[in-house]
Swiss-Prot record:
EC number: 3.5.4.5
Single biological process term from Gene Ontology: cytidine deamination
Organism whose genome encodes this protein: Vibrio parahaemolyticus serotype O3:K6 (strain RIMD 2210633)
Name of the protein: Cytidine deaminase
Subunit structure: Homodimer.
Cofactor note: Binds 1 zinc ion.
Catalytic EC class: hydrolase
Reactions catalysed according to its record: cytidine + H2O + H(+) = uridine + NH4(+); 2'-deoxycytidine + H2O + H(+) = 2'-deoxyuridine + NH4(+)
Length: 295
């Protein structure tokens, strides 16, 4: 991944590469840019807001994990705080294609897990597929969301998805990323399970009530969480494992370093992620233990 970032730097305009290199090559770079850093880059490069976001896409695509398609897609969302979050597509050998994560989903869930309660705009390499348009329509900010493509004028999400079907059609008022804090607790004192409960309390599952969260522990002790992101159209829903795996990659870590996983689900939910979680992790590494709790 670092080599891909270095390649992106080599291909970027000199003024951008010079200013960006110390940021993206730093050991603590977390695939985000603060509003202040973005403003500094605008000033140093004389690029417009749109031009700079498009120029940053190769750096987001550097995080892509696409062993099947070898098609590397990047996306960048701007949270309500003004911070920019990178995302990239993610695929898995030996697992059915429904487990794939698109770049738009990656960037959005990245922002969500880092505390954003909505996104203002999204910048992507290629026109969003129907799956992602539907996924974005679940967002708390869907009505205001702007979509930017290279060499295109900015458009609203609903210009890409007219006459959209969404949460309101099913009587749901709260969207994905809306500020929420469920009150689930678990008697099991295992630290990884407690981290999964924290993720569960962020989750969005108004259609099945399968509020759920997952935590992954790496060999170096780092822990990454994923909350379930359900969708009114069902199929574009993003499972908690995928949300957590996205955080692993965007932190510059690898799947090889996953040491353990914990999944916590609402006992009153109408579905379960357990079987798919186990099968996907087994494809990555059959030795990863999975703890599971219903609360």
């Amino acid at each position: 991944m670092k080599s891909r970032i270095e390649q992106a730097l080599a291909s970027a305009p000199e003024a951008l590469s010079k200013q960006l290199a110390p940021i993206v090559l730093a050991d603590d770079f977390d695939a985000t840019l603060s509003a202040q850093q973005f403003e500094q880059l605008l000033s140093a490069t004389s690029l417009s807001d749109k031009e700079l976001r498009v120029a940053l896409l190769p750096f987001a695509a550097a995080y892509s994990y696409a062993p099947i398609s070898e098609f590397y897609v990047g996306a960048i969302v701007r949270g309500l705080s003004g911070r920019l979050y990178f995302g990239a597509n993610m695929e898995f050998f030996g697992v059915q294609l429904g487990q794939t994560v698109h770049a738009e989903q990656s960037a959005i869930s990245h922002a969500w897990m880092k505390g954003e309660h909505g996104v203002k705009d999204i910048t992507i390499n290629f026109s969003p597929c129907g799956h992602c348009r539907q996924f974005m329509n679940e967002l708390s900010t869907a009505k205001e969301l702007k979509v930017q493509l290279p060499e295109r004028d900015e458009k609203s999400l609903h210009e890409y998805l007219p006459e959209a079907f969404g949460p309101a059609d099913l009587g749901i008022e709260s969207g994905l990323m809306a500020e929420v804090k469920h009150q689930f607790v678990c008697d099991d004192k295992d630290a990884l399970i407690q981290q999964a409960v924290e993720a569960m309390n962020m989750s969005h599952a108004p259609y099945t009530n399968n509020l759920s969260g997952l935590a992954l522990e790496l060999a170096n002790g780092r822990v990454f969480k994923g909350a379930y992101a359900e969708n009114a159209a069902f199929n574009p829903s993003l499972p908690p494992l995928q949300v957590a795996l996205i955080q692993v990659l965007l932190a510059g870590e690898t799947f090889d370093s996953i040491k353990a996983a914990a999944l916590v689900e609402n006992s009153e939910g109408k579905i379960s992620h357990l079987a798919d979680t186990q099968s996907t992790l087994e494809a990555l590494n059959p030795d990863i233990p999975v703890s599971f709790v219903n609360v």
